[in-house]
Amino acid sequence: MDTLPPATSEESFEIPNADVAGSAVLETETSQDIHQLEIEKDAGETDSDAGSIAMNVHQLDTAGEPLQSMNEDEVDPNNESTALDKKEPQSAPEGSENLGNDLFVSGIASRMQEDELQQIFSKFGTVTHVRIMREPVTKASRGFGFLSFSTVEEATSAIDNLNSQEFYGRVLNVQKAKRSRPHSPTPGKYMGYDRRRNSRDFPSNNKDGGYRRNNYRDRDSNRYRNSYRPSRPQREHSPGNYRKERYNVDSRPRRERHFHGRSFAHAEHHSVPNMRNDTPGNEALPSHSSVPPNEDQ
């Protein structure tokens, strides 16, 4: 069997076939990365049968270069592509947080006013604000309100001493308020209805999307009713005239009234009809003119 000539430590050569030891570069692509295989012959090895091969596998990134970690200090704030999205914490709306000195009081009697409620709570500290919620139209008490003390300790003392106490037949419920101020009133029951709107209003197609009254329809309907309304003579509205028209009372004297078409205006000019009975055995009654005068007179 032919043997290869020995190679010195400084000599290296390439073998085009992968079966023979040599230096070849094979590239294999996968879905994740690219592997480059480099095969080199060991210069110090003279064994022709074994042909020891040293393989160095270098794993590279898909882009061919390792990623460089980005530090927050290395970010350019003027560059929008590299600037980090920093969200500042949003502060709560002013007046919405309760520090502990604002109280919510319910069970307030309808006859109790703000000054009286302040006098009750001022025994335990300085009351800086008091408000009883009321109806917007009638101004009647809704039975609850809010108070504020100058310190949290004073508010806590008021809760411990006034909670479940009875005033004017109602029991107070005193506790820390969830908010330092009440919610803004909403349209409707607590803010008051729009008195200009009534049942005849309907939505219109105007730009503001509000409600308006159809003045044209009301004006035309009133004009139609007035044009076809019959005119009646004015009459006196007195109790006597009303009775005459209501019951059709004849104001003439009774003797001048007609009865079935016959007038009895002067009864002395009319003779009473004879009431005769033609039945045999009965004599006719004498008429008014046949009665003889009394001779004794």
Swiss-Prot record:
Q: Does the keyword Nucleus apply?
A: yes
Q: Which UniProt keywords apply?
A: Nucleus, Phosphoprotein, RNA-binding
Question: Where is the protein found, in the record's own terms?
Answer: Nucleus
Q: What is its main location?
A: nucleus
GO annotations of cellular component type: nucleus
Gene Ontology terms describing biological process = mRNA cis splicing, via spliceosome
Compositional bias segments (type: Basic and acidic residues): 209-223, 233-253
Q: Know the name of this protein? A: Uncharacterized RNA-binding protein C25G10.01
Please give the organism: Schizosaccharomyces pombe (strain 972 / ATCC 24843)
